[in-house]
């Protein structure tokens, strides 16, 4: 069964009838307006081929005779209506009528044209139904579908039908266009600038030199049909999805790649058929709702694009039905550099890129070619409306999140060198140029072939290439969990994306205890450490700014005066609450009882001021004796020295320890952000880095420490830094928050919630217990300072240091200083021994806590790339190099008591 292309659908057609839809009723107003079309235009008759069989008199027209016969029979509309409700039009020429017309008018008989179908046994041409392999140009036009019931065209319906719908006419036009093709090549430079406003048929007539005839001439002349009727006809045709420019098709020779089957609408880039330069009869028909006639919705949105087709570099002007109406205002001029339309040998890559997979659902064969090479530095596609055309408009609602690269030719491409070409299937759109910064760092510039320019490295082993996020499998290999059991070597810690680079070589350029030490020699913008950690001294009682050391503690002036009056007075204070009132800068006067208790807990005593004065007096006397050099001594001086020795509980050693004690260090934690494991642990690591710098300065300022070998100095600090920080944190927690929380820093205090959130609750509980020991044992600040110095010399390698003998002597001197401080306030030897036992037992309890924290930090460093915890460079180096030695037993602490 033959299939005829209809309006918006495909339906079977009987051999002698064709159907039209209900749109015919919309032309009623046009029929009433068009009554006297007038004589045929002379140019229309001139261009009509002999095969059209035009009649000179209306009375002898076959259509006129059929109309009269149907009128005599009665109502012709009643019996020609099809089963589906469509109106059926009889064939224009039955075999008998064709023979009668041939006999009655022998001068009008003609030979069949090559493209026309011939009736069996007859030599007359017959208009066959459009086969599936014929182009849409041979389909019935809008006016030919009106049929014999069009009253306004009753006098010239046969002529119009023959002109608009006879295949011989199209064949003659094709022959004339092929004969004049060489003239078009000479006018190539003129055709690239002019705009075709009358459609493809008008361009063909201009090329052949024939006088131009508009559609108005075919519709009945220039005076009988009003302009409003013509505009109404056009509007109704467009609203029904019809193309009124049926004559504006090109010949098969000219329809190379932009024919009506594959051409896009509204001046867009033509969609290319799979086989280049295929002849026109091979073009399969499409339903009108999927073919070029589907242009009603795009016309309203892209009216600015509607205009004459641009001409390519080869001078061929390609067009299709429904796309040739244009005015001078809607013209788009395309420069010759934009080769959107090509004739002859078009690039297959560009052909596949311009193919519209949504508007033309055909089985297009052939794999897609890679995108055409672009500029080496091109990272952004310069969007041109002509690059999208109707393909973009038609597929905008279908592929909103789809592959946009296939619609506009895959123009989003990365650099031609330095990175792999982008595939058209990727929907990533690069919006960063080579000069702009990206989310993960500067983008690799186009044309660079270095591996570093392939893409910026993002966190956790991913890199961002120009077209998206791909896995970086070769740049990172996760470190396996390794617990040393034999020979300890350097442990490879994670890649630099988890370690901040702030420290260079280990304290190589340290110029002294108070010198200008930089964090990293490679960073010129780093200021001295004192700039980052200014000495912040706060009152240990209320937290206000401290004015100095008063009565043995660092306090402000207000707490100094309060303690003097409260300690010397005989008034006893009672707390109205539970002896746990908050004492700060604003509430320090609310409860004198809790404030005085806190003063005693901080180590304030009335005798500390007198002892300090006596110590200064001893220094003055020793200086005078050394300067005098007299062998004889004054008895009064002997009495003074002996009196000072009796009160010598504040030795010079303690003065040095108080002077070199580090100040308060902040962690830089943002307490406004919600607590998380990564944020808390990263802040602890940052605090450890800052405190480690102060530990180095403090250790090098200790008496006798610089006499050690340089390697021994570094080893002692790297082995004991964890115990020193834990011990100092316990003291801060005791003095500031009464051991209820862990006071790591003023901006980083761990309560119960943060202890659980940090996943180190057991370690935090042990550190809080250590802080409580300071209160239970009533540790004084002097004892704390001496114990902290002794803790530095409490862990050494099993094989010993390079100068082990001097280390043992230095450690013994610090033990004697601790015993002297204990004996200073106690006259009973038994009490001194008990106190010494308590303090040394407290020192031994620090080592297990430090070892447990060593294990935790080492495991955290191995998994830092998975848990997003940052480790400063110096911390990562110590943990990866020195901590495994402690965990493996190569380095062991020195205990006072048997464990």
UniProtKB/Swiss-Prot annotation:
Ranges for region Interaction with LPXN: 531-898
Keyword Ribonucleoprotein tagged: no
InterPro entries linked to this entry: Andrgn_rcpt, NHR-like_dom_sf, Nucl_hrmn_rcpt_lig-bd, Nuclear_hormone_rcpt_NR3, Znf_hrmn_rcpt, Znf_NHR/GATA
Main location: nucleus
Region of interest: Modulating: 1-537
Family recorded in the similarity comment: Belongs to the nuclear hormone receptor family. NR3 subfamily.
Protein name: Androgen receptor
Organism of provenance: Mus musculus
Lineage: Eukaryota, Metazoa, Chordata, Craniata, Vertebrata
């Amino acid at each position: 069964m033959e299939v005829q292309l209809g309006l918006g659908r495909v339906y079977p057609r009987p051999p002698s009838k064709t159907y039209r839809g209900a749109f015919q009723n919309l032309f009623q107003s046009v029929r009433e307006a068009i009554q006297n079309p007038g004589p045929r235009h002379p140019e229309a008759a001139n261009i009509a081929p002999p095969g059209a069989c035009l009649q000179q008199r209306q009375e002898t027209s076959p259509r006129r005779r059929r109309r009269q016969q149907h009128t005599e029979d009665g109502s012709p509309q009643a019996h020609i209506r099809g089963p589906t409700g469509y109106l059926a039009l009889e064939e224009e020429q039955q075999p008998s009528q064709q023979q009668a017309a041939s006999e009655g008018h022998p001068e009008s008989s003609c030979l069949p044209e090559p493209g026309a179908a011939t009736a069996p046994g007859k030599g007359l041409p017959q208009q066959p139904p459009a086969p599936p392999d014929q182009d849409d140009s041979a389909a019935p036009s809008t006016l030919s579908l009106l049929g014999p019931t069009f009253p306004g065209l009753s006098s010239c319906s046969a002529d119009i039908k023959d002109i608009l719908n006879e295949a011989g006419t199209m064949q003659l036009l094709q022959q004339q266009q092929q004969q004049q093709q060489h003239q078009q090549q000479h006018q190539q430079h003129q055709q690239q600038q002019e705009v075709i406003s009358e459609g493809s048929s008008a361009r063909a007539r201009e090329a052949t030199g024939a006088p131009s005839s508009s559609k108005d001439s075919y519709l009945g002349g220039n005076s009988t049909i009003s302009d409003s009727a013509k505009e109404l006809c056009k509007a109704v045709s467009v609203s029904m999805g019809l193309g009124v420019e049926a004559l504006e098709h090109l010949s098969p020779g000219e329809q190379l790649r932009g024919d009506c089957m594959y051409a896009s609408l509204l001046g867009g880039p033509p969609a290319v058929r799979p086989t280049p330069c295929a002849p026109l009869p091979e073009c399969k028909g499409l339903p009108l709702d999927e073919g070029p006639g589907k242009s009603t919705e795009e016309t309203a949105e892209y009216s600015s694009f509607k205009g004459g087709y641009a001409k390519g570099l080869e001078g061929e002007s390609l067009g299709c039905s429904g796309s040739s109406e244009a005015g001078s205002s809607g013209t788009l001029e395309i420069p010759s550099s934009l080769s959107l339309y090509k004739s002859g040998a078009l690039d297959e890559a560009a052909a596949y890129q311009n193919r519209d997979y949504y508007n033309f659902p055909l089985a297009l064969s052939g794999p897609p070619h890679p995108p055409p090479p672009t500029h080496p530095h091109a990272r952004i596609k310069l969007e041109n409306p002509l690059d999208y055309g109707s393909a973009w408009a038609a597929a905008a609602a279908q592929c909103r999140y789809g592959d946009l690269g296939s619609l506009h030719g895959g123009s989003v491409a990365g650099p031609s060198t330095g990175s792999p070409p982008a595939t058209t299937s990727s929907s990533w759109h690069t919006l960063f140029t080579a000069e702009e910064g990206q989310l993960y760092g500067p983008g690799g510039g186009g044309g660079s072939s270095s591996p570093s320019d392939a893409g910026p490295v993002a966190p956790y082993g991913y890199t961002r290439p120009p077209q998206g996020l791909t896995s970086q499998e070769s740049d990172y290999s996760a470190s396996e969990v390794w617990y040393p059991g034999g020979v300890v070597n350097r442990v490879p810690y994670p890649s630099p994306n988890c370690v901040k680079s702030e420290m260079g070589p280990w304290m190589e350029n340290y110029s002294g205890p108070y010198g200008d030490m930089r964090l990293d020699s490679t960073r010129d913008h780093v200021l001295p450490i004192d700039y980052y950690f200014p000495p912040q001294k706060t009152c240990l009682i209320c937290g206000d700014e401290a004015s100095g050391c008063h009565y043995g503690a660092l306090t402000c002036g207000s707490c100094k005066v309060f303690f003097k009056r409260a300690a010397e007075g005989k008034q006893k204070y009672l707390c109205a609450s539970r002896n746990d009132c908050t004492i700060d800068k604003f509430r320090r006067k609310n409860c004198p009882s809790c404030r005085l208790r806190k003063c005693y807990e901080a180590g304030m005593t009335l005798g500390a001021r007198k002892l300090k004065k006596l110590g200064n007096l001893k220094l003055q006397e020793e200086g005078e004796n050394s300067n005098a050099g007299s062998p004889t001594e004054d008895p009064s001086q002997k009495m003074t020295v002996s009196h000072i020795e009796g009160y010598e509980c504040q030795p010079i050693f303690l003065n040095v320890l108080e002077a070199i004690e580090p100040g308060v260090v902040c962690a830089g934690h943002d307490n406004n952000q919600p607590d998380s494991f990564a944020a808390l642990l990263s802040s602890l690591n940052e605090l450890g880095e800052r405190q480690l710098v102060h530990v180095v300065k403090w250790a090098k300022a200790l008496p006798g420490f610089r006499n050690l070998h340089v390697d021994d100095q570094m080893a002692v600090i790297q082995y004991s830094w964890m115990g020193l920080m834990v011990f100092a944190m316990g003291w801060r927690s005791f003095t500031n928050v009464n051991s209820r929380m862990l006071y790591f820093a003023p901006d980083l205090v761990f309560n119960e919630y943060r202890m659980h959130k940090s996943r180190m609750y057991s370690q935090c509980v042990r550190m809080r217990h250590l802080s409580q020991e300071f209160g239970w044992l009533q540790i004084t600040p002097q004892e704390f300072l001496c114990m902290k110095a002794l803790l530095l010399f409490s862990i050494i390698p099993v094989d010993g240091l390079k100068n082990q003998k001097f280390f043992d002597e230095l450690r013994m001197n610090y033990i004697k200083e601790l015993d002297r401080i204990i004996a200073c306030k106690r006259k009973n030897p038994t009490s001194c021994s008990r106190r010494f036992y308590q303090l040394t037992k407290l020192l031994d309890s620090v080592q297990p806590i430090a070892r447990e924290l060593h294990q935790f930090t080492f495991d955290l460093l191995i998994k830092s790339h998975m848990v997003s915890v940052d480790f400063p460079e110096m911390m990562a180096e110590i943990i990866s190099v020195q901590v495994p030695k402690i965990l493996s037993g190569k380095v062991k602490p020195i205990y006072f008591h048997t464990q």
